[in-house]
Amino acid sequence: MIGFSFSIVTSWSALSGVLVVGVESGGPPVMIWSWVGVCAVSLAVAYSMAEMCSAYPVAGGQYSWVAILAPKKWARGLSYVCGWFMLIGILSMGAVNNFIAGNFVLGMANLTYPEYTIERWHAVLVAYLICIVAALSSIFLPHLLNRISKAILIWNICSFFICFITILATNDHKQPASFVFADFQNSTGFNKAYAAIIGILQSAFGMCCYDAPAHMTEEIKDARKQAPRAIVMSVWLGFLTGFVFLISLCFCMGGIDETASTPTGVPLIAIFHNSTGSVAGTCALTSLITVVALVCANSLMTEGGRAVYAFARDRGLPFSRALSRVHPTLGVPVAGILATAAVQAAFNSIYFGTVTGFNTVISIATEGFYVSYAIPLLVRILSRVSGDKRERLDGPYSLGRWGLLANVVGFTYLAFAVITFNFPTVDPVDKENMNYTSAASFKFIQDISNQAE
């Protein structure tokens, strides 16, 4: 289960997929120090969620915990909102991962054949292909999930060591320590403080999705121990691998402008090529990460199918009867997986028309997860301060007296992050670079409110 969870969190490769955000908004110092800070507070969130998961191991995860732990008059409404944000986070993150994996493939093609120009529709079609393969494997090869999880954990860790050791060993023109740890880079047009806040978003994106084991609890043995441990361990592994990899990338980075505007569309590929000086070597290293992203696509498809199934089983979705069925022969929620694939493809289709629209999907993906994490933490805080009889949760991961501190620290960070996800990232702001996350979130909340009536 740790392998399954880390294949989704896989922070070191996730950070490389959105590297351009950190490069332009504060540069290496913000990327590195914000990563340390984000991971520290994310551990508070992870331990809080692990405590609830060990007490209530159900496939619904955070929305089920809210339904159980919230005051009765608020439980239904809060659980419903939490479930929808959880679902939109999982589904949109799957689309984002498909896009990132596709970008790696197209970036390698551009590096190998410089005359090839990457078009937006190329990226969408490759994302479609990844989505289809992930859906088919989730439907017809679920019996291989445990083996794949174990194998990808080994592949993930080995790829991490191969990538960072290779670029450090081959790069003979490394950046000075001052560039990595002190020199502030700002291409946003905003002041330094604002740019630093925007730069934190890269770290926030790289450290989420660690709720995945909670949605698999009904299919694993000893779920009260295994799932919470996987939640916590995926954050620890993500922190350590992400920290080392970020420092390695920053030392081996070329010029900021050159890295951010690489024709491959992937700054990581530019850094690999700047270090190795070899197209073949760069493609070999990028291929290692591409495999991680492809397996992540399968894991997110599996998680999404289970989340749709669980929410439909609790009658939280339209067409709940159909979406909550488990195929009698295959033993998986086929309708839930197909619905997940359809929504992912729809999100990817936005890139046909607008880059800004798809960037909004990236923000919504992280915001969806973070809101769904924040609601159960808020419920736990209210339970503790109000003296609710369920103040202490029994389970292998009970936090005891440290629970309130973890809940408060985690909730404070999540609330801050959810607000900053709505900030514009470039000044001057116009209709092309505006951050439409707040508008999309408002429309989403309006829609689920109308459905609830």
UniProtKB/Swiss-Prot annotation:
GO MF assignments: transmembrane transporter activity
Lineage of the species this protein comes from: Eukaryota, Fungi, Dikarya, Ascomycota, Pezizomycotina
Gene Ontology CC: one annotated term: membrane
Record bears the keyword Transmembrane helix: yes
Glycosylation, residue list: 110, 186, 274, 435
Species, as recorded: Macrophomina phaseolina (strain MS6)
InterPro entries in the record: AA/rel_permease1, Amino_acid_permease_CS
Protein name (Swiss-Prot/TrEMBL): Putative amino acid/polyamine transporter MPH_07630_2
Compartments where located: Membrane
Keywords, in A-Z order: Glycoprotein, Membrane, Transmembrane, Transmembrane helix, Transport
GO biological process: amino acid transport
Membrane topology qualifier: Multi-pass membrane protein
PROSITE patterns: AMINO_ACID_PERMEASE_1
